[in-house]
A protein has these predicted regions:
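A cross-kingdom marker for long, charged
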Residues: 29, 217-301
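Flexible, glycine-rich surface segments
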Residues: 159-252
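Sec-exported extracytoplasmic/periplasmic mature domains
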Residues: 51-59, 149-153, 264, 268
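Start-of-domain marker
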Residues: 22-87, 98-100
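Bacterial Sec-dependent N-terminal signal peptides
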Residues: 1-23
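Second-shell loop/turn segments in exported
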Residues: 33-40, 126-134, 244-245
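Acidic/His-rich structured neighborhood in mature extracellular/periplasmic domains
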Residues: 84-196
Length: 301
């Protein structure tokens, strides 16, 4: 009886520990509505496999409690499925809670248009950190590490460095595989370019922005709106530096797609001089988004 109780206790403890190990809470959705003549079962299987792979894998040595898991989303739109090969687009989103509030802020909202991989119904996805398995697990590994890197950066200065390094390892292996979406000079919005926007010295100040904007800015606004907003205003100056160094950097696009609408709310109660300052900064960077940016200068009543 004592032995059985001890076994039950140890097993329960191990189960409890494993439930604390996973870092990601990632919602995965696969949309195959544009594909005809293929059973939807393969796409249901793909969705489940992707979800289990991301959410059940232990990606770090850091212990996360359930309420600390990183919220992310992946929406795969399948454009073509032929000879077990999937071609499509992947929308990835990453969010984080703001301290002492119910508000959740978006860290990343990015569409990857260069997604191709082989998948058959029931294929098992195998994690291997040190060697290349296939393009699907490579893509999932890359975004898992990018999610971790950006999340850690938003809480501490350069806190995400180990995970940018891991993402770089994935990119290096992928480039040897010959798969699309990874090559350095393929285009300025692929996975290699996205990673470089965080690690290249010309654009790496986007990482400082992640910390200043979120930890010193949004997290502080709950207790002092003026102090937090001032930190956000200061953080935006990093965008000017990026623009001056690399005006076509995907870092600028990623910031726009995740933050422009939020900034309208951030500055809704700011002094007019502060709103004007931010408006002037952003209109230089995003001249085609003046209608949205103008709402910062002239908030709707």
């Amino acid at each position: 009886m004592i032995k059985n109780s001890l076994v039950a206790f140890v097993f329960g403890t191990l189960c409890a520990f494993s439930s604390f190990a996973q870092e990601l809470n990632c919602t995965v959705e696969v949309n195959s509505s544009s594909v005809e003549g293929t059973s939807t079962e393969v796409f249901r299987s793909l969705q489940q496999s992707m979800s289990e792979y991301l959410n059940e894998q232990q990606w770090t040595n850091t212990v996360f409690s359930p309420n600390e898991r990183i919220e992310c989303r992946m929406f795969l739109t399948v454009k073509e499925y032929k000879d077990d090969k999937v071609k499509g687009e992947l929308q990835v989103q990453l969010s984080r809670p703001v301290y002492n509030s119910s508000y959740t802020t978006t860290l990343l909202n990015f569409k990857d248009t260069k997604v191709e991989f082989n998948y058959r119904d029931g294929d098992r996805l195998v994690f291997n950190e040190n060697s290349w398995e296939d393009n699907l697990t490579g893509i999932l590994n890359y975004y898992a590490y990018l999610f971790l890197a950006m999340d850690f950066d938003s809480f501490s200065p350069n806190g995400g460095q180990p995970y940018y390094d891991k993402a770089a390892g994935v990119v290096q292996m992928a480039q040897s595989s010959g798969e699309i979406g990874w090559r350095t000079f393929e285009d300025n919005r692929n996975r290699s370019a996205v990673l470089s926007s965080f690690t290249d010295s010309n654009t790496g100040m986007i990482r400082d922005l992640l910390y200043q904007y979120h930890r010193k800015g949004l997290d502080e606004m709950v207790t002092s709106a003026d102090k937090g907003r001032a930190a956000i205003t200061e953080s935006l100056k990093a965008l000017e530096k990026i623009y001056d160094n690399a005006p076509m950097s995907v870092a600028l696009t990623m910031f726009r797609d995740s933050k422009l609408d939020e900034l309208v709310n951030v500055y809704s109660k700011a002094p007019q001089s502060e709103r004007e300052e931010v408006f002037e900064l952003l209109k230089k960077l995003y001249p085609t988004d003046l209608e949205r940016i103008n709402k910062i200068r002239t908030p709707e009543e």
